[in-house]
């Protein structure tokens, strides 16, 4: 993806997100999501338009789900997201292929990134802070959920491909754990 496409994607995500969910929630989502995606890799669309549409849908769905969920249940989202990310990430795919050494390096760093994100969420969840920074907490929680969902989409797409194509498809070294 070229710089112009990235700029367009992030501009649209931040504008739409800010309009629908608030600027602070959207920025905290974007920062956390980029940090998580850097290490987990997840699903990558084949075309720019497909990527843009999936990004907009994923951001919107995760923000709506988190906004509707009482904060007392955020811990379950964190645990679910952590489990999925730790179990599946990083993944390899045709759109962004990583070497084995790159995969190993990312796998080693993922727990540290998750620790930092979880610690930030726990601090934001504390009673005196939560009242003033609830938007940021929702954005971080939505980003964790979104990253976990991209990994699940990747795995489900691989399983679907194996069911449809059976063993006749070419072997790949894509990890689905």
Language model features: what each stretch is:
Residues 46-57, 75-79, 103-108:
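Cytoplasmic-side transmembrane-helix entry/capping segments in multi-pass membrane proteins
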Residues 160-177:
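Short, highly charged, low-complexity non-transmembrane loops/tails of multi-pass membrane proteins
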Residues 17-29, 75-81:
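Structural signature of hydrophobic alpha-helical transmembrane segments
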